[in-house]
């Protein structure tokens, strides 16, 4: 059952326990397995990818079957309803519109003495998107990862996703990928997919940036290949924290908590409220909705282990506790969310008001749903167009400008014991004289 505790209890310790839920001893064993997979794929390429696809996904493939064919992509449209296709297209438009507003612009400043300074943004050459399989068809993951890459101007976007029964990929995932400009799709999942994207194989291209969520093996693989390639983040299990007052609908709050818990047995769903009656009513509503929940086993585990209701003294106290937890998703189900918002410093995405469930942001509001988890919102942000961009500094000095700063550069280079640095300026000054 969903627990209710008061602020006087050791709330911070309980929140820390939930935040640290992925830091168990088994991770070390899993990391050793992942290292083995990475090295095998790096050395053996397709052969290792096919071996691990058989071992972990129970699908026997040939190298030529790794890439999804054009006929499969065409057939996927026949298997998707008109309603779903229209929903994908609506979500795509809104996500793209939001991300186009956030594209950083290159700039150049012309200063005194013909000094030119600036910053130039350019996309990576190749982006690799990972889309999980397993519990659901993650259509929204395709959109949220591919669209920022497309908006950034990445010329080659490839996707990896694990094969299901009979080597099939969910048709909705294939349709979504085509709608947003993914050029290549490979049926490979897990750590072997991350390795293939990071190192390249005979069939799968090496990319520059890998994005997308996955299980602990995928996350560890991304951690270990970072440096060889860029990554978006190290995402843990999903989480929602809801701050609610007496005006919130307990059935809605309960549903929002279950919407998070149904993701994964390790997902976290937390409620902070000032109203004891709401706390009790949410507890009851959660139990009622669990009875016939289609994903009851996993959802019930998440609620039992990582679900929590905390009675707080005030909304200010709730905001401060929320900042310490730094949730991936934060819902402000209060009468005046804009009054609470200034007190929120750390959250991946913030949903304001009684009519803004997290699902709006998950699917089609526009902001990205790939968010920092496990407290990382203290220092990290959502996936964005900038994930797929680099920026280069632009610097040009005239001879006049160089003459004016030569002494300062000489002093700094001499202090650091780097004589050739100083000479590189001195000789240009002497040449000018």
UniProtKB/Swiss-Prot annotation:
Source domain of life: Bacteria
Pathway: Amino-acid biosynthesis; L-histidine biosynthesis; L-histidine from 5-phospho-alpha-D-ribose 1-diphosphate: step 9/9
Cofactor(s) this protein requires: Zn(2+)
Protein residues bound to substrate: 238, 260, 263, 329, 362, 416, 421
Record-annotated active site: 328-329
Keyword annotations of the record: Amino-acid biosynthesis, Histidine biosynthesis, Metal-binding, NAD, Oxidoreductase, Zinc
Enzyme class of the recorded protein, top EC level: oxidoreductase
Positions of NAD(+) binding: 130, 192, 215
Coiled coil: none
CDD domains per the UniProt record, alphabetical: Histidinol_dh
GO molecular function, one term: histidinol dehydrogenase activity
Binding positions (Zn(2+)): 260, 263, 362, 421
HAMAP family membership: HisD
Function: Catalyzes the sequential NAD-dependent oxidations of L-histidinol to L-histidinaldehyde and then to L-histidine.
Record-stated family: Belongs to the histidinol dehydrogenase family.
Name the record gives this protein: Histidinol dehydrogenase 2
Native species: Trichormus variabilis (strain ATCC 29413 / PCC 7937) (Anabaena variabilis)
Protein's gene: hisD2
């Amino acid at each position: 059952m969903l627990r209710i505790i008061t602020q006087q209890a050791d709330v911070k310790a309980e929140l820390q326990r939930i935040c640290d839920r992925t830091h168990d001893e088994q991770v070390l064993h899993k990391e050793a397995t992942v290292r083995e997979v990475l090295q095998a794929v790096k050395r053996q390429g397709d052969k290792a990818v096919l071996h691990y696809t058989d071992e972990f996904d129970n699908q026997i493939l040939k190298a030529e079957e790794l890439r999804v064919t054009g006929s499969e992509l065409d057939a996927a449209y026949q298997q998707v309803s008109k309603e779903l296709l229209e929903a994908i297209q609506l979500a795509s438009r809104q996500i793209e519109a939001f991300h186009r507003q956030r594209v950083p612009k290159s700039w150049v400043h012309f200063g005194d003495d013909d000094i030119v300074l600036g910053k130039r943004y350019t996309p990576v050459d190749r982006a690799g998107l990972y889309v999980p399989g397993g519990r659901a068809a993650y259509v929204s993951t395709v959109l949220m990862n591919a669209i920022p890459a497309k908006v950034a101007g990445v010329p080659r976007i490839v996707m990896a996703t694990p094969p299901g029964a009979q080597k099939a990929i969910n048709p909705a995932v294939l349709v979504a990928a085509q709608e947003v400009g993914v050029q290549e799709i490979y049926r490979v999942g897990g750590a072997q997919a991350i390795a293939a994207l990071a190192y390249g194989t005979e069939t799968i291209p090496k990319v520059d940036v890998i994005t997308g969520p996955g299980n602990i093996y995928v996350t560890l693989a991304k951690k270990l290949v970072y440096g060889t390639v860029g990554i978006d983040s190290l995402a843990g299990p999903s989480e929602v924290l809801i701050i609610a007052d007496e005006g919130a609908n307990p059935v809605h709050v309960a549903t929002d908590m279950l919407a998070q818990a149904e993701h994964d047995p390790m997902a976290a769903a937390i409620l902070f409220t000032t109203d004891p009656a709401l706390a009790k009513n949410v507890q009851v509503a959660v139990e009622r909705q669990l009875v016939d929940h289609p994903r009851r086993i996993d959802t019930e585990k998440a609620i039992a282990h990582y679900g929590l209701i905390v009675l707080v003294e005030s909304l200010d106290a709730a905001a401060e506790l929320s900042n310490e937890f730094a949730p991936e998703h934060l819902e402000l189900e209060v009468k005046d969310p804009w009054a609470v918002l200034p007190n929120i410093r750390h959250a991946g995405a913030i949903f304001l008001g009684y009519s803004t469930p997290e699902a709006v942001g998950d699917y089609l509001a526009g902001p990205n749903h790939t968010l920092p988890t496990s407290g990382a919102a203290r220092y990290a942000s959502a996936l964005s167009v900038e994930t797929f961009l680099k920026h280069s500094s632009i610097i040009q000095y005239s001879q006049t400008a160089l003459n004016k700063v030569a002494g300062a550069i000489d002093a700094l280079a001499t202090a650091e014991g780097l004589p050739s640095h100083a000479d590189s300026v001195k000789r240009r000054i002497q040449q000018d004289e």
